């Protein structure tokens, strides 16, 4: 018969092995998380930035392949996030993927549906809105982890508290602010009047504006692009206005690449249509279509999607301008 002290030692040893196994499992998840979704600080590191996981999509020229594979990749990342919910990199990565998918493969195709398919279009818009909000909330949780209480303060409705919590953000947070703000603003654009979401749009725009203050050239002016579209579409009561839209677009043109077709489409869609500027509209779309996707290998997907949008706008020009 084994001595009681031996049994105790065996039990303690087994417990240590179990704890070690749990620790190793956590370590493995943490290591995998860091590899697939570096912390937001990684955007300041050129080496880590070059290893951005979204490159497998942004460098792809087969839209169907991306549309079919992105949901699976998204769910893999979401499963990893369930195992490591406090990982800021994973929170941001899942948020980005939801917002990218909603924009490229839910909302945008719905915009191309004919008028007699308005029910299908509205269903797609409703789905896109939900995905935008889900993505924004995931990305927001990254900021909440970095700054406990961030969500409460940023949506408090108190201007002073909003400015105070945003003042804590640094250049490291610009990417996260961009995706949170973009997700909420995109959802707002698809939100029926009278819903509760407009109450959050002011905070979302403030996050985007804070991102511009901290890093105006981020992603070749990506934040200015979103703000241009928002300012042009939103009434002044929600912080919009054409004067602000034109100012944001000036910043965008300062930072964007000459091989970026999207800023031409933003100009045509957001600035030319409201002012009935048909000549500017046509010229901008022609410039967008003249760009060779192969000249932008790191952003080929965006070029192809943007040019598809440009062709649709040209084909429906009579819907936007008075004769």
Swiss-Prot record:
InterPro entries: TatT (IPR031823), TatT_sf (IPR038537). It comes from the Bacteria. Signal peptide: none annotated. This is Uncharacterized protein TP_0956. It comes from Treponema pallidum (strain Nichols).
